[in-house]
């Protein structure tokens, strides 16, 4: 009889300054260090983590590169204002009122931030396998892709790629190379494809080169990926959107009741 060997004790193989940055990052993300709060002094951090001055400074530099803290010569390092943002996915299906901007822009303005959407590309393409499956397409079937970059205070916030079946998008503003007033949810309603519900698949991944560059990521942090499939009341998928956000700057808030 073979006796299974015990699993070796887990050990964090990251360098010390990365581990220190991870713990301080958690303090910031959890609100233990709220916006504007001073981080512990170098002496306090040395004592807490049993680390040298140089190691503490390397850890703080990581957080500065991630735009989580700000430090000035002769002043304490502080947690930056408005760094972590909460996204409420349920808002995505809310149509804009006539003449009103896309709800995402309105919500950002309520929090005192300047938000805008940059349309990167509109093209007909063969979508990746997960999008084909989501839209019920066969291998070789094409879809219309609208790529956008969402920015808050001129910093990239989210890379968005939305795919639409050709029979829905053909000869409609979905194929136009300009932004859609009120958002695609409003347009789909006008086209007779009223969004009824959506399904989100959320995962944390290592960023691709495109995502790393588009979001101006500071280092080897994961990105938060959401694949959202939008359905009509009769269950037809009419849109599949891949959304990518910097994992250290955003969280998702879901509200639901028991089935």
Residue ranges, per PLM feature:
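C-terminal all-alpha effector/ligand-binding and dimerization domain
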Residues: 113-259
């Amino acid at each position: 009889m073979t006796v299974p060997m015990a699993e070796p004790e887990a050990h964090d193989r990251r360098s010390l300054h990365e581990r220190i940055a991870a713990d301080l990052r958690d303090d910031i993300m959890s609100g233990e260090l709220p916006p504007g709060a001073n981080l512990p002094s170098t002496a306090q951090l040395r004592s807490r983590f049993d680390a040298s001055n140089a190691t503490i400074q390397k850890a703080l530099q990581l957080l500065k590169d991630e735009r989580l803290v700000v430090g000035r010569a002769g002043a304490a390092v502080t947690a930056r204002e408005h760094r972590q943002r909460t996204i409420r996915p349920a808002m995505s299906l809310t149509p804009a009122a006539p003449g009103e901007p896309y709800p995402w822009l309105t919500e950002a303005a309520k929090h005192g931030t300047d938000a805008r959407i940059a349309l990167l590309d509109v093209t007909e393409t063969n979508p990746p396998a997960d999008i084909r499956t989501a839209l019920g397409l066969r291998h070789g079937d094409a879809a219309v892709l609208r790529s956008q970059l969402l920015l808050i205070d001129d910093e990239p916030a989210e890379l968005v790629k939305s795919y639409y079946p050709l029979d829905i998008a053909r000869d409609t503003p979905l194929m136009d190379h300009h932004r859609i007033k009120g958002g695609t949810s409003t347009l789909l309603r006008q086209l007779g494809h009223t969004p009824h519900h959506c399904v989100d698949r959320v995962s944390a991944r290592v960023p691709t080169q495109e995502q790393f560059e588009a979001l101006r990521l500071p280092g080897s942090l994961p990105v938060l990926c959401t694949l959202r499939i939008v359905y009509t009341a009769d269950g037809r998928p009419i849109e599949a959107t891949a959304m990518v956000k910097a994992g250290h700057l955003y969280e998702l808030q879901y509200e639901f009741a028991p089935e």
